[in-house]
A protein has these predicted regions:
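A charged, amphipathic alpha-helical module
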Residues: 2-35, 145, 149, 153-280
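Redox- and metal-dependent alpha/beta enzyme cores, enriched for Fe-S-associated oxidoreductases
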Residues: 31, 42-43, 48-60, 245-309, ...
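Glycine-rich, highly charged phosphate/nucleotide-binding loops
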Residues: 74-92, 305-318
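Acidic/His-rich segments in extracytoplasmic proteins that coordinate ligands and/or metal ions
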Residues: 85-157
Length: 390
């Protein structure tokens, strides 16, 4: 019997709220010797972790459910909240079920967090995942292949057996299937945003940070089948793209507030690891070379990734607006997020030249006052409707 929408969303919400990662503990306990590797936003090659027989687990901070006490002692106050809440998770034992942590190349703060983790958790595997700033296969490609090879060898030692090319190819195929399902979810949401609200889509995506990819793919398919059976009212809301939330995630209440203000979010950059690679990775040939080519030539465009050409800045954002039929863009970035806030003026300039309406605000993962954001988003939605009617 197919699961009901209520059961699917209940499962997703339970995974989202569980800061003790009980689902990970249960996965490990099911087969003795299993290992879990945590990773932070924005992107890591999860295929390598999966091919090693381990569970990749997205660590997206403590959200608005946890008070940060110990974590504040390791960082100054004028930075984003996610590194401090992640430290709080570690220092309070909530991440003890992780056998290692991967810290992607996002910003200086996360790079420094990887060093803190090495000092504080000496019994855990820790690696900073550097990525190329040069997109030539012979330069940046070789560098990235080397980085992935080091990770592959390290995880092989941790697993007690080498990570083979065949295992990598099989994992690439698994994640290709997952990316297809995620894209189907986003396409459906863009076509019927009243039917699949972003507050639900977000929970379904976040479940994929905890579940094995095979289970997450099935969950998405089940959600799409279940939500299609619902009868939900269509409203005259403004269609918007929400961008800037690629690392520290907004509280769920903020997403709901934007929707309640009269906006349909038809594209976003939440949980970007799910959509970082823009198409399928060939599951034949040299797996690390294929993963490298996908990153260099067919990956997303965000503030944490270097743009080689000035004219490329904002190209994918404009494409997203047009492809998903959006009427405007909401820039929602965490306070003190240097990559997002430094890039914002450049993207706003691109949108202005394209006559695409936009507005902007900042948040923290524990933002509690939603009224100002709801009022701003509502005013933006109203102005879009007035402009389009003029």
């Amino acid at each position: 019997m197919a699961p009901t929408l209520k059961n699917i969303l209940g499962r997703c919400e339970a995974l989202f709220e569980d800061l003790h990662f009980n689902a990970v503990k249960e996965w490990k306990a099911a087969v003795p010797g299993r290992k879990a590797i945590g990773y932070m936003p924005v992107y890591v090659p999860r295929e390598i972790v999966h091919a090693a027989g381990m569970l990749p687990v997205g660590i997206f901070g403590g959200g608005d459910q946890m008070e940060v006490i110990q974590g504040d002692a390791y960082y100054q106050s004028y930075i984003c909240r996610i590194p401090r809440s992640t430290l709080e998770l570690g220092l309070t034992g909530r991440l003890d079920c992780m056998d290692g942590m991967l810290f992607p190349s996002i910003c200086d703060v996360i790079r420094n967090l990887s060093g803190m983790w090495q000092i504080l958790f000496k019994d855990k595997y820790v690696r900073y995942i550097d990525v190329p700033q040069n997109y030539l296969d012979s330069v940046g490609g070789e560098f990235y292949i080397h980085e992935m090879q080091v990770l592959r060898e390290d995880l092989g030692k941790l697993a007690g057996k080498p990570v083979t090319d065949d295992a990598l190819r099989a994992s690439i195929a698994v994640y290709n299937d997952n990316r297809r399902a995620v894209q189907d979810l986003y396409t459906y949401r863009a076509q019927k945003p009243w039917q699949a609200p972003t507050s639900e889509v977000y929970l379904v995506i976040r479940a994929g940070m905890i579940l094995p990819p095979e289970d997450h793919t099935k969950l998405i398919r089940d959600y799409l089948a279940a939500v299609e059976l619902e009868k939900r009212a269509k409203r005259d809301n403004a269609r918007v793209v929400l961008t800037g939330s690629f690392c520290e995630q907004p509280p769920l209440g903020l997403i709901k507030s934007i929707e309640m203000s009269g906006c349909y979010v038809v594209d976003d950059d939440f949980g970007l690891v799910m959509r970082w690679l823009l198409d399928e990775v060939p599951a034949t040939g040299n797996p690390l070379q294929e993963l490298s080519k996908a990153f260099l030539h067919r990956s997303n465009q965000q503030a944490s990734k270097y743009d080689e050409k000035k004219e490329d800045k904002g190209k994918l954002l404009v494409h997203s607006v047009k492809f998903y039929g959006a009427e405007g863009v909401i820039f929602a970035a965490p306070s003190f997020c240097d990559p997002a806030l430094l890039e914002r003026p450049m993207l706003q300039d691109v949108l202005t030249k394209q006559n695409i309406p936009h507005t902007a605000f900042k948040y923290a993962e524990n933002t509690g006052q939603m009224a100002p954001i709801r009022e701003q988003a509502g005013t933006f939605a109203d102005s879009i409707k007035l402009w389009s009617a003029a």
